[in-house]
Regions:
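Extracellular disulfide-bonded cysteine-rich modules/repeats
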Residues: 72-82
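Polar low-complexity intrinsically disordered regions enriched in Ser/Thr and small residues
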Residues: 39, 64-68, 77, 86
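Exposed extracellular interaction/assembly regions and N-terminal maturation sites
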Residues: 1-58, 82-92
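Terminal beta-strand-rich extracellular "head" domains
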Residues: 55-71
């Protein structure tokens, strides 16, 4: 459970955003170093979760941005590295 901005560790794959006051910023691993690996995020607070870099592609496609989770309690997303970016493959 994360209560402040954070960097994803090599041993983590399920991450809970529990930061209460502002958007939570996550530094994702470089997509090229984690090709094929997935990460799962869930919101326990009504705060957005965003990447520190523009490297997340929405389920609808398009250019990579920073958005991972909306500011909704219970929001969740699964992202997978394609070697270039993190692709959102499932979520609410």
């Amino acid at each position: 459970t994360k209560t402040a901005d954070f960097t994803v560790a090599a041993t983590e794959s399920y991450l809970i955003n529990n930061k209460t006051t502002t958007s939570c910023v996550v530094t994702l691993p470089t997509a090229s170093s984690w090709s094929g690996r997935s990460l799962n995020f869930t919101n326990y607070q009504a705060q957005t979760l965003v990447s520190a870099s523009s490297n997340v592609v929405a389920r609808t496609g398009g250019a990579a941005g920073t958005a991972i989770l909306a500011a909704t309690v219970g929001a969740w997303a699964q992202i997978v590295s394609d070697g270039s970016n993190w692709l959102t493959i499932a979520g609410s």
